[in-house]
A protein has these predicted regions:
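Active-site mouth of glycoside hydrolases
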Residues: 1-135
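Extended polysaccharide-engagement surfaces of secreted carbohydrate-active enzymes
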Residues: 137-140
């Protein structure tokens, strides 16, 4: 799997393209919302996995790390921010430098709702489509 990911990142680089790399999808972190799971991450496992990925791709200059995976970072009693903090820290530790990171929220929302003050977040991301059956203009 990762050999194929390596090839795609390198191919994109030859065309001067950036890759938005999502380390995991949201249902692997929290299944209480939607998706089939299984939930496989704890903050500790997320940090280790992040370190693995950061080390593997430390030489790649065409990556934007996108944490999240179509989920709110906080939903009812579920707060996944500590897990995303751990994964972000692992990526940076593995890479040996601060990497460019954002968060993919659920449709019709911005990551700023839950994560705007997070030190690991470099810029907010907005998913404008398919949120509650309508597109959301970025300026709303």
């Amino acid at each position: 799997y990762f050999a194929y990911v390596d090839e795609l990142i390198d191919l994109a680089a030859t065309h001067e393209l950036y890759i938005g790399l999502l380390p995991t999808w949201g249902d692997k972190v929290n299944r209480n919302q939607w998706g089939v799971g299984p939930v496989v991450f704890t903050p500790e496992k997320a940090q280790v996995y992040g370190h693995f990925l950061g080390a593997r791709y430390r030489e790649k200059s065409n990556l934007i790390w996108i944490l999240g995976g179509d989920r709110p970072a906080v939903h009812d009693q579920d707060d996944s921010r500590p897990l995303w903090q751990a994964m972000a820290a692992g990526i940076d530790a593995g890479a040996g430098f601060r990497t460019l990171k954002t968060y993919h929220p659920m449709g019709g929302h911005s990551s700023s709702i839950w994560l705007h003050e997070e030190t690991w977040l470099d810029f907010n991301m907005m998913q404008s489509g398919h949120g509650r059956g309508r597109d959301t203009a970025v300026w709303e």
